[in-house]
């Protein structure tokens, strides 16, 4: 099923028992995090806090708190169906030349779908039903969560940040957290290599000293939100990809104070500028690792205007030790990554990012091994192929007979098929998430690859062991009388 806006999605979730309305007053200061965290760990529903203590605006939490709800948000009924989205992205990233006229004709509908999903601009939009400007802009009137006791202050989390670099037609969409430090000022935490930061840096080079326009959308439709965290090919905008997921063009409206375009159906939009040289120390905040991060300097976003629906819903989340909502998102999007990786490395059987590894810091890859050194080629390829894996610290590569998602099986392969000295690959001075305080230098550290595959001649002089397994004939004979044993 496809959803035009967030409210249609919430209506569908409620009809399926996947949304719970909370009428008891719950405080956005710490209490919402505790309620959401308990609910998410139990595999519970999305939560709509209808009466946040001290505020009139409802708060939506745990929207993507299960992989199934992520799949629903992307227009799929089951998590397994996300592989089809991955296959589409794999094709769009690396379209194969047609083998003939018939093949070209068969590929035409795919490209036509992409071209037909260019976003549509509208003049009137729900997100601009109300306009707050100037001195009336006051973030303290909004139920912005303070998530953990040691957090530096309230934090805007599910913020879809829209920017555009000079002379670029395509806008960049990214999700960056924002610490509230004043009635109309937030710290924009974007890393230097992220799209928003790159657009800002380019703007400063082209227009030194001039403010950089930024828009932030809160409560967009699920396809647009999820499109911003999916590995979309550079040639396709996130808005167009959201249209593909939704099956209809993304409707955009131009901001009141800039040429940036935001989702017309969003609940709330923040419009403003980042002024060159206006920075502040951000943090500390608890993050997806389960620890409080160090403070670091980032640009300050000054909000000139807030537009919103007549009765807005504030969409929020929290981050903490996995599982949290980002970990669940990573678990679901894992299914999207598999076809993309297989397009580049057909020998990959499966690819898994365990949520306990913060959804990106450790990867398990199973392959159909074809030659000595094959595992090392795959681990180096994974690190370099998609920027999403630039911060993956550990990669374990093993054979296709091992279930990548069964940690017991992976540990068995690791301890029986690898030698620490021979099979460990280290890469020094490589990019690392600056939130990773375990690295010796902020933003720079090492990576480790472990070859847990069966070894081929040239990799060992030893006679390699053969796994002890029961033959199929014996299994079949026991299956025939198993029920009579009364052991189940």
Swiss-Prot record:
Prenylated FMN binds at residues 175-177, 189-191, 194-195. InterPro entries: UbiD (IPR002830), UbiD-like_C (IPR049381), UbiD-like_N (IPR049383), UbiD_bacteria (IPR023677), UbiD_Rift_dom (IPR048304). The gene is ubiD. The keyword Membrane applies. Its cofactor is prenylated FMN; Mn(2+). Its EC number is 4.1.1.98. GO terms for biological process: ubiquinone biosynthetic process. Mn(2+) binds at residues 172, 238. Its main location: membrane. Pfam families: UbiD (PF01977), UbiD_C (PF20696), UbiD_N (PF20695). Binds 1 prenylated FMN per subunit. This is 3-octaprenyl-4-hydroxybenzoate carboxy-lyase. Catalyzes the decarboxylation of 3-octaprenyl-4-hydroxy benzoate to 2-octaprenylphenol, an intermediate step in ubiquinone biosynthesis. It catalyses: a 4-hydroxy-3-(all-trans-polyprenyl)benzoate + H(+) = a 2-(all-trans-polyprenyl)phenol + CO2. Keywords: Cell membrane, Decarboxylase, Flavoprotein, FMN, Lyase, Manganese, Membrane, Metal-binding, Ubiquinone biosynthesis. Belongs to the UbiD family. Homohexamer. GO terms for cellular component: cytosol; plasma membrane. The keyword rRNA-binding does not apply. The active site is at residue 287. One of its GO terms (molecular function) is metal ion binding. It is found in: Cell membrane. Pathway: Cofactor biosynthesis; ubiquinone biosynthesis. It is a peripheral membrane protein.
């Amino acid at each position: 099923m496809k959803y035009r806006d967030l409210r249609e999605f919430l209506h569908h979730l409620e009809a399926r028992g996947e949304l719970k309305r909370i009428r008891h007053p719950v405080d956005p200061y710490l209490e919402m995090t505790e309620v959401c965290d308990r609910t998410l760990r139990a595999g519970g529903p999305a939560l709509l806090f209808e009466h946040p203590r001290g505020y009139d605006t409802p708060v939506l939490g745990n929207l993507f708190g299960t992989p199934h709800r992520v799949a629903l948000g992307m227009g799929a009924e089951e998590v397994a169906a996300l592989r089809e989205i991955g296959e589409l992205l794999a094709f769009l990233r690396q379209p194969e030349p047609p083998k003939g006229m018939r093949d070209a004709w068969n590929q035409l509908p795919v490209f036509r779908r992409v071209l037909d999903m260019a976003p549509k601009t509208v003049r009137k939009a729900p997100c601009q039903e109300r306009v707050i400007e100037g001195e009336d802009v006051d973030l303290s009137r909004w139920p912005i969560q303070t998530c953990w006791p040691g957090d530096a202050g309230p934090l805007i989390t599910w913020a879809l940040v829209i920017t555009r670099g000079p002379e670029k037609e395509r806008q960049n969409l990214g999700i960056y957290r924002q610490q509230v430090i004043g009635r109309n000022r937030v710290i924009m935490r974007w890393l230097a290599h992220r799209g928003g930061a790159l657009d800002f840096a380019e703007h400063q080079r082209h227009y030194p000293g001039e403010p950089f326009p930024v828009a932030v959308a809160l409560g967009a439709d699920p396809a647009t939100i999820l499109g911003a965290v999916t590995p979309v090919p550079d040639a396709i905008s996130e808005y167009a990809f959201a249209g593909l997921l939704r099956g209809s063009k993304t409707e955009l409206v131009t901001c009141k104070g800039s040429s940036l375009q935001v989702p017309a159906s969003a609940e709330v939009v923040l419009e403003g500028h980042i002024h060159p040289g206006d920075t502040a120390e951000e943090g500390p905040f608890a993050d997806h690792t389960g620890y409080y991060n160090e403070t670091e300097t980032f640009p300050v976003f000054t909000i000139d205007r807030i537009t919103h629906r007549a009765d807005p819903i504030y969409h929020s989340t929290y981050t903490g030790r996995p599982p949290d909502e980002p970990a669940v998102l990573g678990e679901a999007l894992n299914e999207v990554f598999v076809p993309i990786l297989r397009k580049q490395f057909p020998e990959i059987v499966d690819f898994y990012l365990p949520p306990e590894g913060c959804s990106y810091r450790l990867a398990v890859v199973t392959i159909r091994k074809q030659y000595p050194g094959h595992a090392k080629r795959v681990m180096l390829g994974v690190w370099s192929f998609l920027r999403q894996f630039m911060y993956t610290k550990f990669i374990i590569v093993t054979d296709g007979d091992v279930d990548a998602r069964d940690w017991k099986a992976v540990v068995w392969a690791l301890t029986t098929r690898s030698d620490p000295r021979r099979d460990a690959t280290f890469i020094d001075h490589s990019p690392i998430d600056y939130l990773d305080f375990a690295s010796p230098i902020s933003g720079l550290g090492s990576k480790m690859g472990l070859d847990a595959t069966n070894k081929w001649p040239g990799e060992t002089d030893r006679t390699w062991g053969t796994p002890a397994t029961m033959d199929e004939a014996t299994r079949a004979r026991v299956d025939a009388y198993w029920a009579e044993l009364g052991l189940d």
